[in-house]
């Protein structure tokens, strides 16, 4: 097996990492009292870590598999550099999401080291582009062996907490929602990410502006809007068949091939990046792949987290989405649970959720007091 092939298929998985020894982490806002940390476990196709500690508070993490091969990957990394949260929702196969899980954070660390660890929008954007170029190189090297690798891609949602600022970078249609305390004690749901999906009218106009000479840049097909009638998302890592003409030809499947010459990339790997100064009323963040948001509103998700203990928050959100998926199909949740992967995809997508609770005292000083290079490194299981 070639070195590139070994590199591509290396497992996006580590033993579930040691966490920062932080007894104060339970005192932050949002959710119920933490009551300590809970371990990871499995329940059928569901993997979860009920409660963990990062250097700015607590987090909860869960993923459920629906596809024959799990296409979602995710990670939480925390240390003296701040905190990095990633959700990678693959499509066409698992390879791009696994590659991003293995490489995006490493590129982020290498690039931020050039500026003594200072994090900026440029730092994050460069990390995305370096990851895209790395995956493109593998697609090129393996073109003769695995041409369909050119049709694999992944959405990317990244949150970086650096000092008292949250950076959110997004490609595709995963979403992060902030639970923010109001003056009267309630919580509001504030979406912080941009979704690059052709079903969004703003994205259709963006694509038309970028491709004024192509009346077929977005096509309504099978009940949804798609870029060139093929794919719903307009930005991703991977999907080289939509970005480089040398990968849009035989032997990839006819359904992926564009009839007319490709004058410019049809999709982008440049993320939309938002910077949000953290406020004491910012209680928690819900990072999730679009499989969750197909079934839960932003407000409902925030309500669920707010009204229950922290432990198991991510798992609780996934189960709420599954209950809703079952209701839509007029079936019982207990019957949905009996359906095996692959067939399960007809009822819901792979779903990844990471809930990050914000302890503002710890966030303010954590990057100073942390003495280890990386004190938390958690990645979701590769398969269930």
From Swiss-Prot:
Signal peptide: none annotated. Mn(2+) 2 binds at residues 89, 290, 349. One of its GO terms (molecular function) is protein serine/threonine phosphatase activity. Keywords: Hydrolase, Magnesium, Manganese, Metal-binding, Protein phosphatase. Pfam families: PP2C. Binds 2 magnesium or manganese ions per subunit. Disruption phenotype: The pp2c-d1 pp2c-d2 double mutant displays a long hypocotyl phenotype and strongly reduced apical hook maintenance in etiolated seedlings. Plants missing PP2C42/PP2C-D2, PP2C64/PP2C-D5, PP2C79/PP2C-D7, PP2C63/PP2C-D8 and PP2C68/PP2C-D9 exhibit an increased hypocotyl length, as well as an enhanced sensitivity to LiCl and media acidification. Mn(2+) 1 binds at residues 89-90. Its cofactor is Mg(2+); Mn(2+). Residues 58-358 form the PPM-type phosphatase domain. It catalyses: O-phospho-L-seryl-[protein] + H2O = L-seryl-[protein] + phosphate; O-phospho-L-threonyl-[protein] + H2O = L-threonyl-[protein] + phosphate. Its EC number is 3.1.3.16. The keyword Glycoprotein does not apply. Belongs to the PP2C family. Dephosphorylates and represses plasma membrane H(+)-ATPases (PM H(+)-ATPases, e.g. AHA1 and AHA2), thus influencing negatively plant growth and fitness. Promotes the apical hook maintenance of etiolated seedlings. PANTHER family: PROTEIN PHOSPHATASE (PTHR47992). This is Probable protein phosphatase 2C 42. It comes from Arabidopsis thaliana. The gene is PP2C42.
């Amino acid at each position: 097996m070639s070195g590139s092939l070994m590199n591509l298929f290396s497992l996006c998985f580590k033993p579930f990492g040691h966490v920062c020894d932080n007894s104060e982490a339970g005192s932050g806002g949002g959710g119920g009292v933490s009551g300590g940390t809970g371990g990871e476990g499995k329940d059928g196709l569901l993997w979860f870590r009920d409660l963990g500690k990062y250097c700015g508070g607590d987090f909860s993490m869960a993923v459920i598999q629906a596809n024959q091969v799990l296409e979602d990957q995710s990670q939480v990394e925390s240390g003296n550099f701040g905190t990095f949260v990633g959700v990678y929702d693959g499509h066409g196969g698992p390879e791009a999401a696994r590659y991003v899980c293995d490489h995006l954070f490493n590129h982020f660390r290498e690039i931020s080291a050039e500026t003594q660890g200072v994090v900026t929008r440029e730092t994050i954007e460069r990390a995305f582009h370096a990851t895209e170029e790395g995956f493109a190189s593998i697609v090129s090297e393996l073109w003769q062996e695995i041409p369909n690798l050119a049709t694999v891609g992944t959405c990317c949602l990244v949150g970086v907490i650096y000092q008292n600022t949250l950076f959110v970078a997004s490609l595709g249609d995963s979403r992060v929602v902030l639970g923010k305390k109001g003056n009267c004690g309630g919580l509001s749901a504030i979406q912080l990410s941009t979704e690059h999906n052709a079903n969004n009218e703003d994205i259709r106009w963006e694509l038309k502006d970028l491709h004024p000479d192509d009346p077929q840049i977005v096509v309504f097909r099978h009940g949804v809007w798609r870029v060139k009638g093929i794919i719903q998302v307009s930005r991703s890592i991977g999907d080289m068949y939509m970005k480089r003409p040398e990968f849009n030809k035989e032997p990839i499947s006819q359904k992926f091939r564009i009839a007319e010459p490709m004058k410019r990339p049809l999709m982008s790997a440049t993320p939309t990046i938002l910077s949000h100064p953290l406020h004491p009323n910012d209680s928690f963040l819900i990072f999730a792949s679009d499989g969750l948001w197909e079934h839960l509103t932003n407000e409902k998700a925030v309500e669920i987290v707010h009204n229950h203990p922290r432990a198991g928050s991510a798992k609780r959100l996934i189960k709420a989405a599954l209950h809703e998926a079952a209701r839509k199909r007029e079936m019982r949740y207990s019957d949905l649970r009996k359906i095996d992967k692959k067939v399960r995809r007809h009822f819901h997508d792979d779903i990844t959720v990471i809930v990050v609770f914000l302890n503002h005292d710890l966030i303010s000083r954590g990057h100073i007091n942390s003495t280890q290079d990386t004190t938390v490194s958690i990645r979701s299981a590769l398969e269930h």
